[in-house]
């Protein structure tokens, strides 16, 4: 289960993101950031930190359909922070995030490209 945290004014866009991740086979629960909800250490947190005015469904939809993750242009409209949970779900979630961000994920304070070998730091 992927928990998405968003400020009140970002909930609609976070819900659009939930629909896209659901299409990747990921169960998503959108929560308002101010709820004080606490997670177990092994659960993924995807926090929507900033979303620009563009609609996520319009921006992400066409890029997801049929495009290899590494070819999809990195989306500047969305900045996210997350922690990757342990297997078996960590790899699936990382791949789904990579599809949404053009093959790049932000983890442990750095951008990394997702490949078959794992995460490769991008300088």
Regions found by a protein language model. Give the residues of each.
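Short Lys/Arg-enriched alpha/beta "domain-start" segment
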Residues: 2-6
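Acidic, proline/glycine-rich low-complexity IDRs
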Residues: 1, 14-27, 85-123
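Short, intrinsically disordered low-complexity segments
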Residues: 12-85
